[in-house]
Amino acid sequence: MPKRTKLLPQQTFQVHQPRSLVSEGFTVKAMMKNSVVRGPPVAGAFKERPAKPTTFRKCYERGDFPIALEHDSKGNKIAWKVEIEKLDYHHYLPLFFDGLSEMTFPYEFFARRGIHDMLEHGGNKILPVIPQLIIPIKNALNLRNRQIICVTLKVLQHLVVSSEMVGEALLPYYRQILPILNIFKNMNVNSGDGIDYSQQKRENIGDLIQETLEAFERYGGEDAFINIKYMVPTYESCLLN
């Protein structure tokens, strides 16, 4: 009789899966086998930054400005206690530009209205002050607040036409001013209640950026376009085309 073969219990073998190695991109580890590259952090380019207390607000609260609030049939306006042409622009204009970062009434109203009044009456007093205006402009834009960006763009458009050579004087400062414009250039969607009132108020951020860049090119001299293009690669010339 043939001998029966005794079946042994089936042995199980554990298969060890290779552990994934998490690594940063563009490193030696990232090229190793079983390496999983960690994705980039969320950029937050459009994220609004918190505003800091402005020097403009402190000066206003101390009563350092020769201004008062006046009401008429058209609404609020600034009553200047001195002739605007006689103001010390080196002192006052940078302070008012510092107020571009304000969003609270009456500070934001006085800063914005005051800037436009001073640009309207400044003449040749404006050009020498340009270097002092760059940091307040940059600070306002860097808050990434849509309303503040729109207000600052309108101020920049007024600034370049306020006096001769101002547009050209801004050219060395494109690196400070234009990066935020490059980020928001294609943002043309109203983020409010679904009804787009923005074009009526000229609050359409993408259009305002386009208008501002065109103003920079028109008044910035022959090197303006190439310098704008360097900072905002999608910009196309309004003069060459």
Curated annotation (Swiss-Prot):
Alphabetized Pfam families for the sequence: ParcG
Cellular localisation: Cytoplasm, Cytoskeleton, Cilium axoneme; Cytoplasm, Cytoskeleton, Flagellum axoneme
The keyword Signal belongs to this UniProt entry's keyword annotation: no
Record-linked InterPro entries: Parkin_co-regulated_protein
GO molecular function, one term: G protein-coupled receptor binding
Keyword Cytoplasm applies: yes
GO biological process: cellular response to unfolded protein; flagellated sperm motility; protein localization; spermatid development
Cellular compartments per GO CC: axonemal B tubule inner sheath; axonemal microtubule; cell body; cilium; cytosol; glial cell projection; manchette; mitochondrion
PANTHER family to which the protein is assigned, alphabetical: PARKIN COREGULATED GENE PROTEIN, PARKIN COREGULATED GENE PROTEIN PARK2 COREGULATED
Role played: Microtubule inner protein (MIP) part of the dynein-decorated doublet microtubules (DMTs) in cilia axoneme, which is required for motile cilia beating. Suppresses cell death induced by accumulation of unfolded Pael receptor (Pael-R, a substrate of Parkin). Facilitates the formation of inclusions consisting of Pael-R, molecular chaperones, protein degradation molecules and itself when proteasome is inhibited. May play an important role in the formation of Lewy bodies and protection of dopaminergic neurons against Parkinson disease.
Protein name: Parkin coregulated gene protein homolog
